[in-house]
Amino acid sequence: MILLGQPLHKVPEYFSRKGATAPRKQRLNSSVASLRAAREILSELMLLFAPIDVLNDLLLKTGLSADQINFFVWPLIQIGLVVTLVALWVAYATYLERKISAFMQARLGPMRVGPWGLLQPIADGLKLLTKEDFIPENADRWIFFFAPYIAVASAFIVFSVIPFGPDWAVIADVNIGLLLVLAVSSVGVLALILAGWSSNSKYALLGGLRSSAQMVSYEVAMGLSLIGALMFARTLSMSGIVAAQASDSIWFIVYQPAGFLLFLISGIAENNRAPFDLPEAESELVAGFHTEYSGMRWSLFFMAEYAAMVVVAAVATTVYLGGWYFPFVNRLASVNYNLYVIVSLLVFLVKTSIILYIYFWLRWTLPRFRYDQLMDIGWKWLIPSALINIVLSGFAIFLIQALNGWRGITTIETLDRGLNMTATGKGIMIGIGILGVFITAALLARINWRSRDFNLKIQRRNIKLVNVPKGKPAVQVES
């Protein structure tokens, strides 16, 4: 333990005092030299992640002004990086889903292409590029052509306001970022309707109508579930929401467990993922709204679906899991700011990947709901739950403010960056958040106690037994 605290240039001196032999000294000197070389290489690699120090100097040498670099060149570089990384993320999300499903079913999954099947997404992409781009004879060609691009664009535009990390790890810090996410992501509904209608297929049209009804229904619950967290953040900026959680040193999922569950369920239904994948029910609608699509256009819908899953996971990470914030990571900023940004990026990716794993886990665990159950969950359960959560959150904040200063009790520290509370205020808020889950469940059970969609007892009572007709059968079989 004493050796771990020694600087590199004092390690040989430490062993010489301890009476180390010559061969051991030589091995030690070579090890120290290797460590120094590794540290120099690491420091040089860190320069690659210092855009202000290195890349800005290179760009200034090209003759561009500082304003052109800041407002034109840098956004293009960030957009290119985000699109490339998200596309790779989406490609390997399919690989992870196949591996997870194989693990649950005691199989190996993709193993043929590359080591452990790691090149399988690349092989799938090449296969789709070589497939025939088939367009139905009576389809509306232009709408049929543009629908997949609308779906992909609506998913990828959202990443422009997602804070993957501090400083240069976010493309645009918009003061209405969360509202922009909800507005742009809802455009994806238009792509599915256009794809179903332009295909001139009854199965595609029914799939498009189902998806539009489902997504519009669950968008309401998704938006309402975020209001409770916004009451604590006091801003619509995505970076501001992360800063509010960092300044209060706590994630909003602790205050809003019900809001997080509501948002996650609504997001899964919004993405048409199992158990809410009614628009793509194979037994009823073949492949839903993309039944008539093939080749690369079909893969664009596939990419849009997985990109939308990443969007929901990233928004849940930002609003409820602290985004790139993690305890004690901010101390790296004073040591090496570039390392701090990289570690923050990794923290964000790990949190988002955990939520994506929940997506895959639920798909291979739960059966598909009936359509009436699907709509009832959205309108009779999630929307009332979100409204109850808003009322309870408002009551909790009112109680915290009312108790502040009462009989020497201090519950609020500051309101500069969100609602920053003392340990007493945090304890009260956590208790109300946990209690709110049970209050919401009790109220929903009371509201829907006569509903027969999920009540097996009522369904059994409504079953009418058919009396067996009297007499002999028309055709008698002789034994």
What are the language-model segments listed below?
Residues 13, 20-23, 32-35, 95, ...:
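General helical secondary-structure elements
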Residues 4-10, 17-43:
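Short, low-complexity, charge-dense intrinsically disordered segments
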